[in-house]
């Protein structure tokens, strides 16, 4: 007899009770039985919640023996009726059912709430009501039982993953930002952190562990935020939540996460697999710490920050990135009438574009400024079509660092205020929200730009940066600035005037030439490798490809060499002389590493450059400003300062409507603190 739900009374939930698992003597299959009771949540019933994934739980790529999940439903008996569940939920119930009656109270699952069973998934009205109650359901639970999926033969007992977490948890916070880390295979990495060595195999097991789907689920954010206690199951193993959070903090606060990315990317390249780097970029276990630390935050959480951090997690439905954080922002059971109206305004639609627009308006109104615009990614990375240009796509990966800062800095230490003196007016919370009214001043038109970060890296097009500098030095449009001033504008712009977290000063100026050395060394290295490979080529097709690439890079080499010679003659403290570059490259090639002081400079200055230039490009304006902004910028785009925005922005006029498209936030040297915020403000609309 198929299962039928009875209607739920308002304020009630269903709980699974009398869970039992028995094995069939003839087939060995597990038979699951349970009952489903209705209880009033307001009476404070004792129960646990299950946190799991509806989809395949494992990251199969690094498993020696992959687990094949079937897209079929499995029968259980509920209230004497047939009920169907997924394979992963069946596995979870089998393990949980077998653990009942254990010696520890935390292992006794007498009553448990599971969304797929306790909510009538075919009743849309009930689903909306129960989803709105979920944060309270998890907050009231005695424990949240996490099912990560089955134990796998590659890592019996999760021993390797557990050892890595145990070792990472021993890193002292004082070493998080101070330890210099080189490579996961180098002993000095672990010595500098004060921990034991971790082998490559252990890192791979740990990588497969953290890429289990549960860690990247968007709804996990809400479930873990409100949980009182955790029981973490990985197969029959119960793992300590404290070690998981400690490891997540270590990955987030050190560069270990980046080194893990590099190691996995190298491994993929070796076995000719599609790169996993994009998966590791968001390091799901490290991201758990973002929301875990919110619990101890004293000041109220802003919707802006929660929406920004939602990018680090996966969601089957794009709108869930907003819906899953609303109760963290303003718990439903604790909302004032006005806050309930605001939440209802956001949830009025389930269409992702509309949900994102509404949430953006609310976030801007809450912060009372326009720094929310710094969360808007370059349009190359946008996944949702139809979004207004000023609305962030929260489903896009967080591949750049917002200039205005995220999380926000305290006003007392915030460095930039490009719109100083301009008055910001909050937009209304209405249904006519496709257009965003703003006020500001147009500053100048873009006339020239360099290549993107990826082309600087992959195609060695650093010469385009030098070309912009050369034309900038030759331009007569901005009298009154010396050659020294223009070189300073150039190098400070490329690192957004920031070095080691501070305003760029003499140390940054000294280190800057290593950017030129680094990029030229990469070009030199590829050319040398191609020429050597040509001596041992295996087929004619390969020969043709290599010859063409060598010709292309040789031309780039010559262009770059000429520009370096020309520019270093004007200021070799910023653009080093050719012989200085060659000497540095020779030391690097001969010793496998730069001398210690040079190595420290290249690591620090490249970190500053990458943070500033990632997903951006250098530009020059008609009146002689240098800046960096979104890589999709184009000639004739206009630099503006907008009331309420801490940094300048680049806008593009839409000729058909007279409105403006938001291109991206910008660092523009010389106008970061109100220098250009003078004159009659214009009122415009962003669309």
State where each predicted segment sits.
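A short alpha/beta connector and helix-capping loop motif
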Residues: 122-152
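A conserved hydrophobic secondary-structure block that centers on an alpha-helix together
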Residues: 111-114, 119-121, 125
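Active-site neighborhood segments
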Residues: 74-87, 118, 129-130, 141
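Amphipathic alpha-helical interaction segments
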Residues: 96, 100-103, 120-124, 145, ...
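Active-site palm subdomain of RNA-directed nucleic acid polymerases
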Residues: 77, 81-114
């Amino acid at each position: 007899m198929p299962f039928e739900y009875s209607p739920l009374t308002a304020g009630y939930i269903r709980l699974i009770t009398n869970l039992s698992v028995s094995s069939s003597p003839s087939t060995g299959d597990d038979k699951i039985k349970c009952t489903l009771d209705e209880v009033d949540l307001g009476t404070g019933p004792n129960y646990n919640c299950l946190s799991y994934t509806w989809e395949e739980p494992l990251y199969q790529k690094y498993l020696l023996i992959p687990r094949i999940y079937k897209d079929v439903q499995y029968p259980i008996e509920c209230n004497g009726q047939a009920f169907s569940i997924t394979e992963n939920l069946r596995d979870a119930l089998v393990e949980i059912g077998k653990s009942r009656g254990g010696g520890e109270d935390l292992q006794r699952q007498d009553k448990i709430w599971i969304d797929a069973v306790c909510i009538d998934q075919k009743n849309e009205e009930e689903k909306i009501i129960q989803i709105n109650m979920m944060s309270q359901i998890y907050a009231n639970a005695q424990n949240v039982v996490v099912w990560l999926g089955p134990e796998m033969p590659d890592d019996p007992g999760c021993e390797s993953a557990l050892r890595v977490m145990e070792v990472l948890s021993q890193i002292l916070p004082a070493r998080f930002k101070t330890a210099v880390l080189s490579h996961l295979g180098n002993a000095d990495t672990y010595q500098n952190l004060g921990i034991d060595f971790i082998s490559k195999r252990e890192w791979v097991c740990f990588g497969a562990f953290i890429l289990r789907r549960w860690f990247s689920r968007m709804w996990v954010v809400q479930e873990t935020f409100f949980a009182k206690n955790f029981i973490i199951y990985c197969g029959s193993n119960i793992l300590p939540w404290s070690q998981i959070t400690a490891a997540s903090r270590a990955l987030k606060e050190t560069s270990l996460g980046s080194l893990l990315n590099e190691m996995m990317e190298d491994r993929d390249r070796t076995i000719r697999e599609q790169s996993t780097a994009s998966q590791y970029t968001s390091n799901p276990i490290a991201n758990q710490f973002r929301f875990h630390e919110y619990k101890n935050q004293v000041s109220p959480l802003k919707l802006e920050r929660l929406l920004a951090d939602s990018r680090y997690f996966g969601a089957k439905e794009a709108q869930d990135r907003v819906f899953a954080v609303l109760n963290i922002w303003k718990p439903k059971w604790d909302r004032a009438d006005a806050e309930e109206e605001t939440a209802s305004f956001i949830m009025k639609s389930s269409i992702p574009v509309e949900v994102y627009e509404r949430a953006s308006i609310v976030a801007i109104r809450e912060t009372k400024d326009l720094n929310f615009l710094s969360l808007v990614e370059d349009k190359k990375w946008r996944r949702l079509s139809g979004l207004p240009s000023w609305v962030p796509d929260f489903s896009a990966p967080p591949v750049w660092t917002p200039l205005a800062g995220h999380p926000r800095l305290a006003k007392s230490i915030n460095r930039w205020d490009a719109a100083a003196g301009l008055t910001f007016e909050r937009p209304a919370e209405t249904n006519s929200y496709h257009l965003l009214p703003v006020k500001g001043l147009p500053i100048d038109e873009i006339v020239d730009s360099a290549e993107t970060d990826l082309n600087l890296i992959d195609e060695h097009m650093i010469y385009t940066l030098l070309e912009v500098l050369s034309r900038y030095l030759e331009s007569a449009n901005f009298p009154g600035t010396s050659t020294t001033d223009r070189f300073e504008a150039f190098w400070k712009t490329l690192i957004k005037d920031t070095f080691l977290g501070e305003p760029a000063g003499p140390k940054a100026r000294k280190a800057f030439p290593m950017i030129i050395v680094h990029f030229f060394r990469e070009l030199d290295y590829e050319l040398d490798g191609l020429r050597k490979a040509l001596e041992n080529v295996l087929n004619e097709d390969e020969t043709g490809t290599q010859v063409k690439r060598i010709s292309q890079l040789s031309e780039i080499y010559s262009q770059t060499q000429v520009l370096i010679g020309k520019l270093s003659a004007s200021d070799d403290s910023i653009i080093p002389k050719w012989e200085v570059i060659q000497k540095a490259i020779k030391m690097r090639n001969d010793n496998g590493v730069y001398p210690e002081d040079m190595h420290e400079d290249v690591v620090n200055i490249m970190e500053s450059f990458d943070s500033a230039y990632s997903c951006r490009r250098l530009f020059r304006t008609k009146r002689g400003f240098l800046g960096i902004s979104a890589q999709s910028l184009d000639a004739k785009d206009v630099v503006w300062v907008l009331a309420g925005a801490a940094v300048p922005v680049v806008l593009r006029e839409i000729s058909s409507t007279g409105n403006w498209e938001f291109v991206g936030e910008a660092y523009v040297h010389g106008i970061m603190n109100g220098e250009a915020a003078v004159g009659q403000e214009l009122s415009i609309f962003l669309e």
